[in-house]
A protein has these predicted regions:
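Intrinsic, short, N-terminal disordered tails of RNA polymerase sigma-factor systems
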Residues: 1-236
Length: 236
């Protein structure tokens, strides 16, 4: 990954109404729409109400000319998005009625193809403090996107069926004793199956790092961000 051209770097260095920066921010918002909805639902909102408010939040976020005045240390889109969401909610609570949009507002919305279906939510997630809850939903979204990218690669290579059989070793759903049966189904030895699983895991990790990199502005932050997200998944 070239950190000079990650989506978050393009956003951070955009000036005014830079088309490149605005598109990069729109892409990031579309990618991480679901953690925002989950955060809003955690506060007791119904599904439809949370999604409507999420769209309003992203609309306002995308109308900003640029991240003017953003703290230099804000090198993670995750941190920026959560801070912006908290600020938005504080403003919403202060309003006694709906604020009318200005006539000079530029309307920018999420792409029509944005997946707004419910994402992964761990059963006990609502028991976490708000920030930790958001980070866990964020981590789940990162994993989901990396997994989807891997599935897309296998489909493009004509390996959809093989991937479906190997998938349990990525998700942790493979039961003891499944290895021999899977090897027979694929027509390979158990040794070859172990190699295939190892390669698949390695590729998944590469795609995971690539996905995380798009939300950072420096390679130095990668190791820390990965540790943070895995800790969020573990609840520790």
């Amino acid at each position: 990954v070239t950190f000079h051209t990650t989506r978050w770097t393009l956003v951070r260095h955009a000036t005014g109404r830079s088309a490149v920066g605005r598109q990069a921010l729109s892409d990031l918002c579309a990618a991480y729409y679901e953690p925002v909805v989950a955060f809003l639902r955690r506060e007791g909102r119904a599904e439809d109400a949370a999604r409507e408010l999420a769209h309003e939040f992203f609309r306002k976020l995308l109308e900003k000319p640029a991240l003017e005045g953003a703290a230099p240390a804000l090198g993670r889109f995750r941190s920026y998005l959560l801070g912006a969401l908290k600020h938005f909610l504080a403003r919403e609570r202060e309003r006694s009625g709906r604020q009318k949009r200005g006539g000079d507002a530029v309307s920018v919305s999420l792409d029509a193809g944005t997946d707004t279906s419910p994402g992964l939510v761990l059963a006990d997630s609502y028991e976490l403090p708000p920030d930790e809850f958001f980070d866990r939903q964020w981590a789940l979204a990162v994993l989901d996107r990396a997994f989807a990218a891997l599935a897309g690669e296998r489909e493009a290579a004509g390996k959809t069926e093989d991937f479906a059989r190997l998938k349990p070793w990525l998700t942790g759903d493979a039961a003891h004793g499944d290895q021999a049966a899977t090897a027979r189904a694929l027509g390979i030895s158990e040794g070859a199956l172990k190699v295939a699983v190892h390669r698949l895991r390695r590729r998944f990790r590469e795609l995971l790092k690539a996905e995380i990199a798009q939300t950072l502005d420096s390679p130095e932050a990668m190791a820390e961000e990965m540790r943070h997200l895995f800790a969020a998944l573990g609840g520790s």
